[in-house]
């Protein structure tokens, strides 16, 4: 007698033949998804977190809650907890590079400082304390039409040989003729010229977004309270008027400039579309009608949901979880996926499709008591920030 699988084969062959003749269409036509009980999913997630916390703390069971002392935490413990929280917040706030923008080659453009003969230089006070560098923003916009395409901007200065050490400061010009401090540099003596570079990406991106015609920087000697001499002793190429002829031309070409690195304009629409899709995913993740793999909000109150009083800080946190289908491509050249769908119909416990899983996880700092002793711990991978199909 043939095995049961072979007995079913004659019944499946007509259906498989029909699938082969069917044009590619969405997987929803043969969806076997059942209605999801969100409350059940949340309860399972809460119980998983209960075990996760105990496991990470190497505790077989929750500590005794009768010995937790009343009142506020000791000052040293609270300071340690707050500093740990600040560190985690700082790390999570760091902007992650976008894969699309990082992939494409960057166009590099050099925009020279406006020549000293321009009328704009008459609007600032001249003296031995500072030098001024102005840039035509129309040239910047011609190089980078969209501020979001700018990857990096550097102010490059060719300093001449320097016989004494000097501390210099860089400032940005504001519209009301005030100056905003940006950065500083300690310059050491040198017998040869040397290029100086300042990261001014944020400033240039701001200029590209505004409508000003001329924007500028100021390089000044550091004003020391211990010294009355605030002369800018470092020489910057392009500010010397003693050169003539070819040497003056070379000086002019090496005068201060902005080095711009930006994604090519032809990629702008593609990057905008991908950002728009990511923004929609972020918004829709918390909608009850969302059907894709995404982050679902879940706040866990330690006392209410877990019945724990031994975790003193925080009182709860957004653990979140990933949920949603991960459809795979159905087309004439991937008909095997339809066979897998039939397989799943007859084997509901198995899964050959990709799953919705966490992509970015963040740690959770806590203060808890073991007996009457408070401890600060950082639990890794406790907060789901984004999901992916894998």
From Swiss-Prot:
UniProt modification remark: Transforming growth factor beta-1 proprotein: The precursor proprotein is cleaved in the Golgi apparatus by FURIN to form Transforming growth factor beta-1 (TGF-beta-1) and Latency-associated peptide (LAP) chains, which remain non-covalently linked, rendering TGF-beta-1 inactive.
Per the record, which residues fall in region Arm domain?
75-271
User: Does the record carry Disulfide bond as a key word?
Assistant: yes
Entry GO MF terms: cytokine activity; growth factor activity; type I transforming growth factor beta receptor binding; type II transforming growth factor beta receptor binding; type III transforming growth factor beta receptor binding
Specify where the region named Bowtie tail lies, as residue ranges. Answer: 226-252
PANTHER family named among the record's database cross-references: TGF-BETA FAMILY, TRANSFORMING GROWTH FACTOR BETA-1 PROPROTEIN
- One Pfam family assigned to this protein is TGFb_propeptide
From the UniProt entry, list the residue stretches annotated as the region Straightjacket domain: 30-74
Q: How does this chain assemble?
A: Homodimer; disulfide-linked. Interacts with the serine proteases, HTRA1 and HTRA3: the interaction with either inhibits TGFB1-mediated signaling and the HTRA protease activity is required for this inhibition. May interact with THSD4; this interaction may lead to sequestration by FBN1 microfibril assembly and attenuation of TGFB signaling. Interacts with CD109, DPT and ASPN. Interacts with EFEMP2. Interacts with TSKU; the interaction contributes to regulation of the hair cycle. Interacts with TGFBR3.
Recite the UniProt keywords alphabetically: Cleavage on pair of basic residues, Disulfide bond, Extracellular matrix, Glycoprotein, Growth factor, Mitogen, Secreted, Signal
Name this polypeptide is given: Transforming growth factor beta-1 proprotein
| GO BP, sorted A to Z | ATP biosynthetic process; cell-cell junction organization; cellular response to transforming growth factor beta stimulus; chondrocyte differentiation; epithelial to mesenchymal transition; extracellular matrix assembly; extrinsic apoptotic signaling pathway; hematopoietic progenitor cell differentiation
Annotated positions for site Cleavage: 278-279
| Disulfide feature | 285-294, 293-356, 322-387, 326-389
Name the job this protein performs: Transforming growth factor beta-1 proprotein: Precursor of the Latency-associated peptide (LAP) and Transforming growth factor beta-1 (TGF-beta-1) chains, which constitute the regulatory and active subunit of TGF-beta-1, respectively.
Sugar attachment sites:
82, 136, 176
